[in-house]
Amino acid sequence: MIIFAMAPAFAADNYQTDIGPTPKNGRQGANVQGRGTVLATLDRTTFTIQGKFAGLSSPATAARLHMGNVMGGTGPAIGDLNIPQAKSGEISGTFTLTPAQVAGLRLGRLYIMLDSQSAPKGNLWGWFQPAHVTVPEGTPQMGHWYIPNLLDGQGDGPAKKSNS
């Protein structure tokens, strides 16, 4: 008897974001603190999010997945994420994305916004990008390492130049 191992027809895509402080104005500086890392998997239309955050100046109150018009741009919430009402903890959630939301994810338009008591309109923010190597600040890297260019539609590096 011969047994063949079959790979799934569609492999899951991995994404990540580092969520960090995003003060809306100079008065919020001391209140907008903390950091986090979030990993996500897209399996067809199921988007599963797992991550951690820490260092908030006050307890978290809510976290949501959003879709903006561009990477770095803001937009409406897609849905709520699970978080503890604490200064540190885990972030999680599972969403069924629409085709437009899947396309937005692939263009870097989906992001997380975590609110806290001292920054109720966004304490930590981060836009999802394809999973990539990250290293500590000041660590040199060799070779092709930069985040894929989402603008050329290939997700494989700098936009290609055409001679035609």
Regions found by a protein language model. Give the residues of each.
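Metal-centered catalytic cores of metalloenzymes
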Residues: 10-63, 67-164
